[in-house]
Amino acid sequence: MQTATSDAAGDARNLWNSEMDSETKEALDGFVDLSLITEVLYPVKSGKEATVFACRAHPGTGAEFLAAKVYKHIRDRSFRNDAVYQENRTQMYHNTRVRRAYENGSEFGLEVHFMLWVGQEWEHLTKLHGAGVYVPTPVKQAGRAILMEFYGDENGPCPMLHHADLTRQLAQDAWRLIKANIEMMLQANFVHGDLSPYNIMIDSSDPGDMVRIIDLPQAVDARFNPSAHDLLLRDVETTFRWFEKRGVRDNAKGFTSDLWRRWKRAEL
């Protein structure tokens, strides 16, 4: 497995006893108590919404490493609030009080929205993995944390596509795999909605299984979201630009139009 160099990997051991905040530690301790992980190795990525940690897996899981994605506390996080991602999602708020609290932006409403957001990523991971899409294998959700397959090792994570160094042939192979996965996602009625070279991981040592698509909480259901086609086109064009700069030739708009037409006709 080819991994990216992680500056944090060498000096971020024993995080439980250093800079990790108590709520994050509690979330990760839950996975230890469940005999799913034995050690937190290093922080992989910290964003506005969550921090991902590389963990040593418990032998009983059958894995060597796992990734723990811990969503940040409500006071520290900044969730995607774009209306386009929320279209037709008010169906999640069946309780009138909950729906009103969310629409009014109260702390209670935001907390409910937060837990639904975490739950959405778990649900999307589970459904897409079951549909054969190359997403991390989901292991467990516990509160505000999700445990999943880790694409990397003790030395660091596999690189994001944005940082990957691929030959033209490997780039062509990767693009074919990504297109196949975009198609499988739509076949399962999902559009990623934020796909880019920054959330596709690459392991060029295994050309047949070299990609993992990550960051899925904002994915939309193409059957209900009226912006699904536009989001799909943006996903394809944004991702393809990276490949186009590396000599890969394709018609991103043509691929998207044909894919959408076949999905609408139930031909996928």
Which role fits each region the language model picked out?
Residues 17-157, 183, 187:
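Conserved ATP-binding subdomain of kinase catalytic cores across diverse folds
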